[in-house]
Amino acid sequence: MQQTRTEAVAGAFSRCLGFCGMRLGLLLLARHWCIAGVFPQKFDGDSAYVGMSDGNPELLSTSQTYNGQSENNEDYEIPPITPPNLPEPSLLHLGDHEASYHSLCHGLTPNGLLPAYSYQAMDLPAIMVSNMLAQDSHLLSGQLPTIQEMVHSEVAAYDSGRPGPLLGRPAMLASHMSALSQSQLISQMGIRSSIAHSSPSPPGSKSATPSPSSSTQEEESEVHFKISGEKRPSADPGKKAKNPKKKKKKDPNEPQKPVSAYALFFRDTQAAIKGQNPSATFGDVSKIVASMWDSLGEEQKQSSPDQGETKSTQANPPAKMLPPKQPMYAMPGLASFLTPSDLQAFRSGASPASLARTLGSKSLLPGLSASPPPPPSFPLSPTLHQQLSLPPHAQGALLSPPVSMSPAPQPPVLPTPMALQVQLAMSPSPPGPQDFPHISEFPSSSGSCSPGPSNPTSSGDWDSSYPSGECGISTCSLLPRDKSLYLT
């Protein structure tokens, strides 16, 4: 039983070996038949391809045309297929010149890099030839100037316009082809010449398909730039430089857009509230301003836009008539105009109740009676201010001309109720002996103005601009309205 099993296994193994051997033999035979029989390694001098027509006569030659099986298909004749490096059948009479062209490849052998036989006889693709040139291109770096001179001289001699047919001069054709071969070598090494390179096909022949060497020159130049790390010059560097856009300058004489009455009222009032209470939030300030705006009458609300337009025209006087926002000279503070005794009497002379009595006869806002009054940071109308708080002799002295407390040449444009509200919002600092409030809360914006004695000690030039020397406000940092300051 065991012997029978062993014989069966041996028989199966032998059959397997025989089958595998038969297949291997068939493969070897087919390979030998393919190499030696159908595709013989025969290189034809007139063809750049293996002579397939010799081993298999059934294949069509390159000069034959294929006619359809039916006689009705005469319109569908396929044109002859021309290899890249072969001329068309109509140009086969130039074969002698082709032979001279094939011999040109022998001429240029720098440093023994190129073989002594032509590219056509080797049947090497143009890519392989260009790779061979690229690998050994560093050996040609020393001869680049010489090659360039040869190219320029040969092409100049070729383009000189000599009489006679081009194909009838083998020497001229040879020199032109050698120049083109040299220029092709230069282009393989990444050097761009100003000469337009043509494909190394005969000048008189026309190829149905583009030459592989002309199509691979650009690819090899790209590879050279990648390997050598050189940067390809940009096509047009002038396009990259973009002119920066110039910002349009704002015309100072351009009229401003009209501002709403509530915006002007909110701007002036919230500045005064923030000056007194820096820790107040924006919401609290907005509520206070809204309550003050609601308490105003319709006529007062409508008069605010007209005043806003007047103020916008004041903000844009001619350039030579602009008064300075800040005094161009340093003014001493309040303490320099008052003696220590006068200053002490001014600080402790009266109680804050005098301010309440002064404003009690006016229609005051109920929402601001209990809030802490902040100092105003915007100009007030001096006439209204003096009529509210100054004695009669001081009012008569200041009514002509009125002192402008704003940088604009015209008087301030705040309405009467707004001036009253600011009086309520002022700090309860004790007024002076003449029962008018302290107005030094805004010395930086409109100058230092201080109450002084009946005979103040100040500059005579300043006192001459007022009609009386007994003015309550003896010195101010700004000039009267009729003496506007001109900028130089």
UniProtKB/Swiss-Prot annotation:
Keyword Transcription regulation: yes
Biased composition (Polar residues): 302-316
First-listed, main subcellular location of the protein, grouped into a coarse class: nucleus
SUPFAM superfamilies in the cross-refs: HMG-box
Region (Required for transcriptional activation): 76-114
Pfam families tied to this protein: HMG_box (PF00505)
MF term (GO), any: chromatin DNA binding
Any single Gene Ontology cellular-component annotation: nucleoplasm
Chain positions of motif Nuclear localization signal: 223-252
SMART domains referenced in this protein's UniProt entry, alphabetically: HMG
Composition bias type Basic and acidic residues, residue spans: 222-239
Region (Disordered): 192-258, 293-328, 363-473
Locations listed in the record: Nucleus
CDD domains linked: HMG-box_TOX-like
Ranges of Low complexity composition bias in the record: 204-216, 443-460
KW Methyltransferase (keyword) present: no
PROSITE patterns: HMG_BOX_2
Biased composition range(s): Basic residues: 240-250
DNA-binding region extent: 255-323
GO biological process: positive regulation of transcription by RNA polymerase II; regulation of transcription by RNA polymerase II
Annotated protein name in UniProt: TOX high mobility group box family member 2
Provenance organism: Homo sapiens (Human)
